């Protein structure tokens, strides 16, 4: 993932990690860590209320994929994954999603800490509070094999098939969760109790064999909902 800021240009020098602009961030709440910590998918959370939308949390899978430690990432915008080959039109698509507070999924060229380029299937999605105010952005990354150009399509088809196993109510809950709403707001939108929403989310996670809400959001966006 890269450049979840507004319109600040990426470094573009071809030297991964060259942009070391950093802001001070406070430790995130436990529920933010719970969102991504156990996910096998490389995931991060950023705070758009702070200057330059810096990362406030990453998981171990992100370190395993990119080579960057938590200490090297927190407080920085994700543009440090960009380099000379990063496609500017795809960067613009991510920025547009951030500006409009809409989920966006692109396959973009990024660079690991050691300079290795990789095709990155990047998801960026908003997270709202109970008053429908933007809190954070969730980002997740999956390395795509350039030798398998249809891999992205296969993931989308698989995600769509997974969602077909859900009941209509479970699909409604999943759709609202993927849009960034938390349980209280989902409950209000559907006229359900918060306890019932939590029950449906739990059943969805179990049925789809997912570990975290971040994984659920990615599946939903990949499926096109």
Curated annotation (Swiss-Prot):
InterPro entries: PAC, PAS, PAS-assoc_C, PAS-like_dom_sf, Sig_transdc_resp-reg_C-effctor, Tscrpt_reg_LuxR_C, WH-like_DNA-bd_sf. CDD domains: LuxR_C_like, PAS. Residues 183-202 bind DNA. The keyword Flavoprotein applies. Residues 1-10 have a biased composition (Basic and acidic residues). Residues 1-23 are annotated as: Disordered. FMN binds at residues 77-79, 95, 110, 141. FMN binds covalently to cysteine after exposure to blue light, this bond is spontaneously broken in the dark; Cys-78 is 3.9 Angstroms from C4a of FMN in the dark, suggesting this is the adduct that is made. Residues 102-156 form the PAC domain. Has reversible, light-dependent DNA-binding activity. Upon illumination an internal FMN-protein adduct is formed which changes the protein conformation so that the previously sequestered DNA-binding domain is free to bind DNA. Binds to sequences within in its own promoter when illuminated but not when it has been incubated in the dark. This is Light-activated DNA-binding protein EL222. It comes from Erythrobacter litoralis (strain HTCC2594).
């Amino acid at each position: 993932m890269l450049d979840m800021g507004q319109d600040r240009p990426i470094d573009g020098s071809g030297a991964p990690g060259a942009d070391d602009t950093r802001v001070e961030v406070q430790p995130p709440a436990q529920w933010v860590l719970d969102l991504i910590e156990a996910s096998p998918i490389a995931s991060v959370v950023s705070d758009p209320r702070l200057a330059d939308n810096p990362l406030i949390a990453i998981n171990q899978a992100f370190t395993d994929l990119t080579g960057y430690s938590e200490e090297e990432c927190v407080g920085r915008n994700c543009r440090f994954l960009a380099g000379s080959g990063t496609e500017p039109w795809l960067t613009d698509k991510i920025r547009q999603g951030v500006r409009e507070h809409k989920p966006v999924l692109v396959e973009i060229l990024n660079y690991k800490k050691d300079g290795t380029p990789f095709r990155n299937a990047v998801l960026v999605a908003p997270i709202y509070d109970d008053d429908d105010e933007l809190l954070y952005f969730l980002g997740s990354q999956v390395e795509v094999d350039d030798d398998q150009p249809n891999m992205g399509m296969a993931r989308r088809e698989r995600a769509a098939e997974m969602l077909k196993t859900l009941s209509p109510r479970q699909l409604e809950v999943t759709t609202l969760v993927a849009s960034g709403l938390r349980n209280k707001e989902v409950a209000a939108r559907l006229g359900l109790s918060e306890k019932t929403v939590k029950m449906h989310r739990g059943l969805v996670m179990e049925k789809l064999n997912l570990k975290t809400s971040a994984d659920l959001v990615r599946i939903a966006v990949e499926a096109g909902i």
